[in-house]
Structures are given as structure tokens and as C-alpha cells.
Design a protein with these regions (language model features):
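DNA major-groove recognition helix of helix-turn-helix/homeodomain DNA-binding modules
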Residues: 53-73
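Intrinsically disordered, low-complexity tails and linkers flanking structured cores
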Residues: 84-164
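A short, Lys/Arg-rich alpha-helix, primarily the initiator
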Residues: 1-21
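Short alpha-helical DNA-recognition segment
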Residues: 24-42
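The alpha-helix within a helix-turn-helix
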Residues: 20, 31, 60
Length: 164
């Protein structure tokens, strides 16, 4: 059985390509931000290499920074919340539908669509699959939660080391 840190790492790796594109980054951009090559990012996205905890923390940190400092990209925090932070709140079918919808939005983002237009694409893709209502609560819960993921990891590490 996988622990919660492993599940979070797998979720990020499974969705890294879509998240990166919605952030507006190339593989090279993300690699530069975390100190690895674009080939390393490609290998993570294509699952040629497993993502480790250090890579997870580095990527989540730059994503948090982007969310805090790029208020024009309103889709990124929603996608992070849906695919990573609140994924357990969806049944498997809904989560799969959301992943597919977000993947479609990421294609628009990779093509240069950004800001309010990307937000419209995001809403437009969710509406036909009946997921707008399903994501309303998780999206509303974004405020103040952009770094709670690291608290969960550190708490687990502290518990393993006998610290409270």
C-alpha cells in the first residue's frame, strides 16, 4: 500500500505535462526553475524515470510561487487543487473525466491561450461533462491552501523520526 506522499508524487507525475502547460512553461522553463534539464522533465512526464520526493517538493514550490505571483493565471490554482490537493474527493470516473478535460485545456495553453481566455476554455470544457458543480467546492477551497501540501509531508517525516 502506498503512503500519502507516494500518492501525491504519483499524481503530480501523472499530471505534470498538463500542469506545466497550464502554467505557461516549456519543459526547458520548468527544468531551469528547479535546476534540471528539459530531458529530465520529459523523462518525468513520459514516466521513463520515477519522480522522487526532492523533485516533487521543487516542482510544487515553483508552482506555489507561480500561483502567488501570477494572478492572471486563474486556471493553474484550480487545476492544482483538482488534480493534486482534492483528488480524493472525486470518484474514479469523475477524476478521469477531469484529467481528460484538463488535458484538453493544456493543449490550448500550450498553443498560447492564457489569462481570461484560458479560464473561459477551462469553464467551457468542464460544462459539457457536468463537472462545474463538482469542482465548485474544491475550487472555493483554494484560498490559503497553496502550501498545505508541504505541511502534510513534513508532518509525516516528523512522525517517522519521533518528533511531534
Amino acid at each position: 500500500m502506498k503512503n500519502s506522499s507516494q500518492i501525491q508524487i504519483i499524481r503530480l507525475q501523472d499530471n505534470l505535462s498538463s500542469i506545466r502547460k497550464i502554467a505557461g512553461w516549456t519543459a526547458e522553463d520548468l527544468g531551469e526553475k528547479i535546476g534540471v534539464t528539459k530531458q529530465t522533465i520529459s523523462n518525468l512526464e513520459n514516466k521513463k524515470s520515477p519522480m522522487n520526493l526532492t523533485q516533487y517538493i521543487a516542482i510544487r514550490s515553483v508552482l506555489d510561487y507561480e500561483i502567488e505571483n501570477n494572478k492572471e493565471n486563474t486556471v493553474l490554482p484550480q487545476v492544482i487543487t483538482i488534480l493534486l490537493d482534492k483528488a480524493d474527493e472525486f470518484d474514479e470516473k469523475d477524476y478521469t473525466n477531469l484529467k481528460e478535460a484538463i488535458s484538453a485545456v493544456s493543449i490550448s495553453a500550450a498553443g498560447g491561450v492564457a489569462g481570461a481566455t484560458l479560464a473561459s476554455v477551462f469553464t467551457g470544457v468542464l460544462a459539457p461533462i457536468g463537472m462545474l458543480g463538482a469542482v465548485a467546492t474544491p475550487i472555493g477551497a483554494i484560498v490559503g491552501e497553496t502550501s498545505y501540501w508541504i505541511a502534510k509531508i513534513m508532518k509525516k517525516k516528523d512522525e517517522k523520526q519521533g518528533r511531534q
